[in-house]
Each structure stands twice: as C-alpha cells, then as structure tokens.
Amino acid sequence: MTLFSSISSISNPMTSSKSSISSFGSGTSIGSNSIACGGCGGGSGGILGSGLGIGLGLGLDLTGGSRTRGSCRGNGGSSNPVNGHGGMGGGNGSCCGI
C-alpha cells in the first residue's frame, strides 16, 4: 500500500501566473507490475477563481499489469468544479501522467 501527500507549485505559461497544486491521495496495488495513482489537482481556473486546485483521489489496481488513475478535480470555477474519474483496471484518466 502506498500513501502519499505532496504540495508543489507550478507556473502557468499561458497566464504567467503561479498556481498551487495540493494533492492528497492513497494508492493500493495488488498484483504483479501494477500501478496505482492517488489524486492530483490544479488547473488554470481552480476553485474560488484563485488559481488553486485541490485534488482528492483514490487509485485502486486489483489486476496485474494494469493501471488505474485517481480522480481529478480542477480546471473549473468555484461554482463549476470539474471532476474526472479513471476506471478500475486500466483507466485512461488525465491524472498522474504515468
């Protein structure tokens, strides 16, 4: 089982503004050569219109050799957050970039 928490900041080349990314997630992998990714967040809009994105995700991989991406939240305004979810056993979500 893998548990991680990371906080980082990136620069958005389109708006020349700095956006913070705070990610909290846990991944559990069962099987050979499996990869589980936790959550990741961020985005140009972010929540509250401040460029801050927070992602909470849980990645579970129960089949050997497959990938599951955690859930994503970001790229939306305070009233319209955008959520994306990867499927179990080989989801192709936009999170984790692995």
Swiss-Prot record:
| Chain's gene name | hssl50
Which residue stretches does the UniProt record annotate as biased composition, category Gly residues? 84-98
| InterPro entries membership | HssA/B-like_chaperone, HssA/B-related
What is this protein's record name?
Answer: HssA/B-like protein 50
Domain of life (superkingdom): Eukaryota
Indicate the family of this protein. Answer: Belongs to the hssA/B family.
Its source organism is: Dictyostelium discoideum
Q: Where is this region: Disordered?
A: 1-26, 68-98
From the UniProt record, give one GO term of the biological process aspect.
sorocarp development
